[in-house]
Amino acid sequence: AKGVQVIIVKDGSDIASPDDLEGKSIGVQTGTTGDTYCTGDYGQEHVKQFNNGPLAVAALVNGQIDCVVIDQEPAKNYVAANSGLKILDTAYADEDYAIAIKKGNTELLDKVNGALKELGEDGTLQSIVDKYINADAQ
């Protein structure tokens, strides 16, 4: 499945696209791909890490940071629950979801691949993606 990293800003923010993030204070959830991307693109000094998404959004609402970079689906919920926030139209990054298995563990790999094949063939995988991820299964 595909995921999208989006940017949440306050209404009236001067941030209109990812191009405007240079020099800004960017909130991220610690250890996420948004954290990795933003730290790599803008440096640790511009990235403020939070233990979870709601804490990052609260910091944005309180004016402690300029924006939040986070997965699209939770971002929609955070914006719906906090008036005065919006998601920018331009995504920060697109990414693929994946399952990691220790190299050489063919027994587990075969079981996971078999289960995914079954779930794909009977439509269960697409139903899960549609309900919880809201993206196209790949």
Residue spans of the language-model regions?
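Periplasmic-binding protein-like
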Residues: 1-9, 34, 38, 72, 76-138
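Residue-level signal for nonpolar/aromatic packing positions in well-ordered secondary structure
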Residues: 7, 21, 38, 60, ...
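Flexible hinge/capping segments at coil-to-helix
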Residues: 9-26
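Short helix-initiation/N-cap motifs at beta->coil->alpha
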Residues: 13-14, 30-33, 48-62, 95
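Short helices/loops that flank or line small-molecule/ion binding pockets
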Residues: 19-22, 40-41, 54-69, 73, ...
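Short, Asp-centered acidic motifs that coordinate Mg2+ and/or phosphate
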Residues: 25, 66-67, 86, 98
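Ligand-binding cleft/hinge of the Venus flytrap
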Residues: 34-51, 79-80, 134
